[in-house]
Amino acid sequence: MTVSLEGLYRGESLTSEQTEQLFGELLRGEMDPIVLSSLLTAMKVKGESPSEIEGAARALIAAAKPFPRPDYEFCDIVGTGGDGLYTINISSTAAIVGATCGIKVAKHGNRSVSSKTGSSDLLEKLGIKLDMSPETARHCLDEANICFLFAPHYHSGMRFAAPVRQALKTRTIFNVLGPLINPARPTYQLMGVYSPDLLEPIAETLHALGLKKGMVAYGSGLDEIAVHGETQVAEINDGHIRYYTLTPTDFGLKYYPLESIQGGTPDENRKITETLLAGKGTDAQQAAIAINLAPLLKMGGLVDTLKQGAEMAIETLRSGDALDKVTQLATLSHKE
């Protein structure tokens, strides 16, 4: 191993370069599992720094299967997971509605780790081929405004960390890396985090990784923008990071109790999503999708305000057109 961990054991942070080197070794299968275990634990106890998160993310992006990146603007909407609140699939549903509105979304996701249904679990239930090739995914993004990048398909080196992660049974740096390592490298992004302590380090990391426009959100216990309370936000805009609070009122929406957006099993969540996309969801469910899609519609230039974004999202949901978008994506995803 080329980088000494002595400083880390003393509570000092690694540099971005040191972390990138270490994670490069891990992804090539060159790191002893005991060393990896102590690396992850020492980082967790100290608290992962922005430089460490950035270095690890750079190593994962560099080692990922390449994606034919387009030259147009496109986004991702994703959460860290780990909030333990088992809501409906907000980000996946919002991605589909966003594509129907006219923004382009390259959704990077995985199977569920801590919730009942991850984005992959849901999209698979909707008939979308998870392991489509990068070229097919790019074609979907071009033609349908949306594609799905299944994390294990692009980040095969992560398999070397899996046994240690399972044995540790605790959150580590990997829990926050997933949303940062989309191999398509979106130009703008909404990312939800499971703790307010992550707002600043994640915003700084996204900025360091070159994201021009983005929002990191923690919504009263949720890794989404909340319909049931306040949302703390870190907004990235051309090199500046601004911290503030949002409420449903800022979107022209009412407050709804958290129980009104509860999810369930993969089958139950698929039914809820299909009902929503067909224009028949509850007001609370529609509000949860709209409040999380509105910032992306604004960043993507389709609207000028968050209220206009929420209105566009709800109008699109109620039209039922988003269900056709799922059919289009499912069909294109199977064409190799």
Swiss-Prot record:
Q: Give the Gene3D superfamilies listed for this entry.
A: Nucleoside phosphorylase/phosphoribosyltransferase catalytic domain, Transferase, Pyrimidine Nucleoside Phosphorylase, Chain C
Q: Which UniProt keywords apply?
A: Amino-acid biosynthesis, Aromatic amino acid biosynthesis, Glycosyltransferase, Magnesium, Metal-binding, Transferase, Tryptophan biosynthesis
What's an example of a GO molecular-function annotation for this chain? Answer: anthranilate phosphoribosyltransferase activity
Q: List the cysteine pairs that form cystine.
A: none
Where, in this chain's numbering, is anthranilate 2 bound?
R165
Q: How is the cofactor bound?
A: Binds 2 magnesium ions per monomer.
Q: Which residues are 5-phospho-alpha-D-ribose 1-diphosphate-binding?
A: 79, 82-83, 87, 89-92, 107-115, 119
List residues binding Mg(2+) 2.
D223, E224
In its keyword annotation, does this UniProt entry include Metal-binding? yes
EC number, UniProt record:
2.4.2.18
InterPro entries, sorted: Anthranilate_Pribosyl_Tfrase, Glycosyl_Trfase_fam3, Glycosyl_Trfase_fam3_N_dom, Glycosyl_Trfase_fam3_N_dom_sf, Nuc_phospho_transferase
Q: Which GO terms describe its cellular component?
A: cytosol
GO terms in the biological process aspect are: L-tryptophan biosynthetic process
Kindly list the positions annotated as binding anthranilate 1: G79, N110
This protein's pathway:
Amino-acid biosynthesis; L-tryptophan biosynthesis; L-tryptophan from chorismate: step 2/5
Write down the chemical reaction(s) this protein catalyses: N-(5-phospho-beta-D-ribosyl)anthranilate + diphosphate = 5-phospho-alpha-D-ribose 1-diphosphate + anthranilate
Query: Which residues does Mg(2+) 1 bind?
Result: S91, E224
Cofactor list: Mg(2+)
Q: What does this protein do?
A: Catalyzes the transfer of the phosphoribosyl group of 5-phosphorylribose-1-pyrophosphate (PRPP) to anthranilate to yield N-(5'-phosphoribosyl)-anthranilate (PRA).
Family recorded in the similarity comment: Belongs to the anthranilate phosphoribosyltransferase family.
| Subunit annotation | Homodimer.
Q: What is this protein called?
A: Anthranilate phosphoribosyltransferase
Gene of this entry:
trpD
